[in-house]
Amino acid sequence: MLTLLINLLLLLALSSLASFLGLRVWINRKLRPNPEDLPKLSISKDSPLYKNFYDLLDQAPSPEHSLFYPLSPLQDALLERIKLADQAVGTIEAQYYMLNDDEAGNIFLQALTDAAKRGVQIRLLIDDIDVIQREDVLIRLVDEFPNFQIRVFNPAWLRLIRKPEFLVRFPRLSRRMHNKSYTIDGIFSIIGGRNIGNEYFDLKHELTFADFDILFAGPMVQEVRTEFDTYWYSGLCSDIHTLGHAADDEHYAEWRNKLSTTYAQYLPILMKDRDQVLPALKRGEIQPYYAVVKVIYDSPDKILTSVFKPDSLMLNEVEGVIGTAQQELLICAAYFIPSKHGMKVLKGLRDRGVKITVLTNSFESNDVMVVHASYSTYRKPLLKMGVNLYELKSHDRHADNEHSLLGSECTSLHAKAFFVDRRKNFIGSFNMDPRSAIHNTEMGAIFEHQGYAEMVTQEIYDFVDSQAYKLKLGKHRRLEWQEPLKDGSYRVHTKEPKMTERQRLLLPLIAWLPVEWLL
């Protein structure tokens, strides 16, 4: 009897394994990509954006130079997106990792919808991380406007029971499109670290991210569009219609009313006492920067490669630029997990006498504890190496502070940028962690501009002097956090600030888990 029971259990286990492997093979074969040819790109020369800013573009030092200007503070970055959509006459291409179902997301979608009403061709490419339970209204939206297309990158197919599919298709379903870009009429592009959501624009949200965005115009915009089309036509994106059913009339009407009501409520708030970048550039009140800009990005096929043999074009490009540092490297990284390989790169720079400064999140400002736990294992080695290490304080939301490029009342760092020798600049979606290097697809822009790099570098140094803990090795080589105070003095913490005793016990246990390669 016992032998029979064991045989039955063994048969059940083998059957389950065979079913699991069979389902995995079937799904992955079904989802094998079938790329389309990329179309030729064109510029909407009848666009007001082209007519109004041609003179500024014509002032570039060479045809290879692009115009650029940083977007700050937080709400201005959302307002510029809205006003760009308002002026569109030809095309809008938007690519985001997250497009939240909140006020900022509603405002953004309403701006796109208004453009679609005018006949603008809209293409919205979003990752599946933020689509679940909204497929129905998005399907109705594109049904209402044939010139509004939505595609979803690397979608799950079992929409209501994602966890079993996640297990079957791991690690592919854990690999996401982290790219972020927004292009209007082929004239202007915005790229940087921001997704679309309240926390990225300080809009009715207790959590506010400090981040970078830059507005670009010129030849680099065509590179951004090529990146967009590479993903759009990769065969790894699915039309929104294939992922669900259209919402009924009542539900769709309620949703559309929510979009328009939110837009009408918040637009006056966004515009109050704010001078937009584009009109200010046109009037000559602010001066644009010019640089030869290189747009870099991972192939969408990266999600098909083995995580143990990653093919990351972004990692190679980023490492190549960092490796050119001769005097100074400044890194702003929301999630900083350098890995053994990254530590070797930084050690090589320090051996050459390069000053390295890193700004990342503290425990109190980090929104992912397991990431902080992994990062915490690198702090002492970095300090021993001579790296200047700063951790952002989680800011008092009601403090009265001056605005800076990173924002004044931010509770968490989300920026992904670095600056080499106060001359070379990188901005994009790439975090200094294994998830960006191995798992997700990423994009960014690299350019040289000494004046801009010096300005931003100095702003960041001024920012950390008042808004971040400076880490030191104190007595017995123990970590200390120097907290800047308003009177210019420092308070020294010998224990990690804003952490309970329970959390202090948990942190090394979490750090011990073998999950760094997933973070």
Residue ranges and their predicted role:
Residues 2-175, 184-519:
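Charged, low-complexity intrinsically disordered terminal segments
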